[in-house]
From Swiss-Prot:
Residues 289-291, 388-392, 443-445 are annotated as: Important for cleavage of target proteins. Coiled coil: none annotated. GO terms for molecular function: aspartic endopeptidase activity, intramembrane cleaving. GO terms for biological process: amyloid precursor protein metabolic process; amyloid-beta formation; apoptotic process; calcium ion homeostasis; cell adhesion; endoplasmic reticulum calcium ion homeostasis; intracellular signal transduction; membrane protein ectodomain proteolysis. SMART domains: PSN (SM00730). The gene is PSEN1. This is Presenilin-1.
């Protein structure tokens, strides 16, 4: 309890002397009124002291506004950085696909269809072709939905070994079988003679290094390169074995499904991301392309005995957060030598006594502890910039490349439509990352980019290209 100010105590005594004849109820009312006035007086006194100390009441608002401005600057900084860090791999994946489509005729020949698209589009009427493409798209999307739900259920019930086995088998097929087919077709196209032993050694080294980099550990650039390569290989398979109308319809429907799966409260992809966040786990590297390292190596904790030696006879170490790492120098033999003196770093008891006599005893306060914790957290945040990564699903890479590859393979063979689709996808990706910086939650990456890509494709192929052909035919220059 704090003492009452002089005017208030005087008022209290006078009031009590005048009202001795009143009942206890009146006294209780006076007491409540006095407590109310006491609270008002304390608030007025607090405001007076804050103003006298030169601190305006709106200082806290200014601090909040300053923190918000710093957060916005940080968002813009990392947003622009990671936009470029995602533009490069997406561009590389699409360039690999387009270059393969333009040079290797194997991926433009219609040799068959996927088992998930059983209906052919070689029909007599447009209505039958449209119906078959719709049925193919429904079957394909159903398979994708079932596989996604199965993955979420396995992850929900911690069936990590099953998921790892599933992803490893998929990676093995892509890195060995599809890579062998791709390499063989490239050698045939450029008439490169190669024996089977050399091809086997090449594919073996390529596949084994890829499996290690993706599913275990490896340099970040190597992991990213393999993820881009397997995305391009999968996109080439879809481009070759998906009929034309079915491919466009699948791209349109998959963007809508991606929107529902990520944003709906019970969407499978949203449940997957939320479950990973609740468990504080990173998603599997074989599913996600990250602009930073996917696998994290935790720092080893310091030796408890060494920490006790370092923290002995030191009041400053009491202010250090318990989770901050302790860094010691010296060889192992020096730390184990029993003859050496205590490792006080020159800050002996005499030095501390002399310091206390000059400056007074050094005690930690709540403010100093909070300041040290904020400083240590800022240092740790600055030391781990790799965790500030933007992650993009490999499915997004695949369908971006399918759109550009189909445009390159089916659109009159001109570069205008291909480049238009390429620019549209990058614009959509930029807008998606902008929305990600604004809403700060997981967002679908397909809807905006695929919508722009489809609009640019059909507008360029059916409007811009005929217009340019007519201008060239009549020799008009704009």
């Amino acid at each position: 309890m704090t003492e009452l100010p002089a005017p208030l105590s005087y008022f209290q005594n006078a009031q009590m002397s005048e009202d001795n004849h009143l009942s206890n109820t009146v006294r209780s009312q006076n007491d409540s009124r006095e407590r109310h006035e006491h609270g008002n007086e304390r608030r007025r006194r607090g405001n007076t002291e804050s103003v006298s100390n030169g601190r305006a009441p709106s200082s806290s608002q200014q601090v909040v506004e300053q923190e918000e401005e710093e957060d916005e600057e940080l968002t813009l900084k990392y947003g622009a950085k990671h936009v470029i860090m995602l533009f490069v791999p997406v561009t590389l994946c699409m360039v690999v696909v387009v270059a393969t489509i333009k040079s290797v005729s194997f991926y433009t020949r219609k040799d068959g269809q996927l088992i998930y698209t059983p209906f052919t589009e070689d029909t007599e009427t447009v209505a039958q072709r449209a119906l078959h493409s719709i049925l193919n798209a429904v079957i394909m999307i159903s398979v994708i939905v079932i596989m996604t739900i199965l993955l979420v259920v396995l992850y929900k019930y911690r069936c990590y070994k099953v998921i790892h086995a599933w992803l490893i088998v998929s990676s093995l097929l892509l890195l060995f079988f599809f890579s062998f087919i791709y390499l063989g077709e490239v050698f045939k196209t450029y008439n490169v003679a190669m024996d089977y032993i050399s091809v086997a050694l090449l594919i073996w080294n390529f596949g084994v290094v890829g499996m290690i980099a993706i599913h275990w550990k490896g340099p970040l650039r190597l992991q990213q390169a393999y993820l881009i390569m397997i995305s391009a290989l999968m996109a080439l398979v879809f481009i070759k074995y998906l009929p034309e109308w079915t491919a466009w319809l699948i791209l349109a429907v998959i963007s809508v499904y991606d929107l529902v799966a990520v944003l709906c409260p019970k969407g499978p992809l949203r449940m997957l991301v939320e479950t990973a966040q609740e468990r504080n786990e990173t998603l599997f590297p074989a599913l996600i392309y990250s602009s930073t390292m996917v696998w994290l190596v935790n720092m080893a904790e310091g030796d408890p005995e060494a920490q006790r030696k370092v923290s002995k006879n030191s009041n400053y170490n009491a202010q250090r957060p318990a989770n901050s790492p302790v860094t010691t120098t010296g060889t192992e033999s020096e730390s184990q030598d029993p003859v050496t003196e205590s490792d006080d770093g020159g800050f002996s008891e005499e030095w501390e006594a002399q310091r206390d006599s000059r400056l007074g005893p050094h005690h930690s306060t709540a403010e100093s502890r909070s300041a040290v914790q904020d400083l240590s957290s800022s240092i740790l945040a600055s030391e781990d910039p790799e965790e500030r990564g933007v992650k993009l699903g490999l499915g997004d890479f695949i369908f971006y490349s399918v759109l550009v590859g189909k445009a390159s393979a089916t659109a009159s063979g001109d570069w205008n439509t291909t480049i238009a689709c390429f620019v549209a996808i990058l614009i959509g990706l930029c807008l998606t990352l902008l929305l990600l910086a604004i809403f700060k939650k997981a967002l679908p990456a397909l809807p905006v980019s695929i919508t722009f890509g489809l609009i640019f494709y059909f507008a360029t192929d059916y409007l811009v290209q005929p217009f340019m052909d007519q201008l060239a035919f009549h020799q008009f220059y704009i």
